[in-house]
Amino acid sequence: MSLRLGVPSKGRLMEKTFAWFGAHGIMLSRSGSEREYAAEVHGIDGLELVLLSAGEIPRELQAGRIHLGVTGTDLIREKLVNWEQRVEPLVELGFGHADLIIAVPDCWVDVETVDDLDGAAAAFRQTHEFRLRIATKYHRLVREFLRGA
């Protein structure tokens, strides 16, 4: 049986992941065309490389289809409920940083804090009879942040 390592399948995260492992004596490379999700591992026996989107890696870890994965902590926290009980971070790789921010249109000159946003949302709901919507792909992280604000 081999260990299955999930890594990002494209872009800067894949390149940085391959470079990080290469610097530690484990060579990762794509095999086949750019459209194929095939890869090879050199420098260590018993390790199978699985190329996935960074967003799929948390779920594949949780499901047990991969044993190790390289992805962002933002994606782990967003995709997995009670993530602390489901996965164990092993190494901080030092790349792929992401800042999550709450932004409003420039014309909202009176909204400078989360409390201001809360007031604007309350006024919006009273006027329009439905809630103000926040566009995000990080629903859980935004909800946790706003509940704690």
Where on the chain are the PLM-derived regions?
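Domain-level signature for soluble enzymes in the chorismate/prephenate branch of the shikimate pathway
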Residues: 1-149
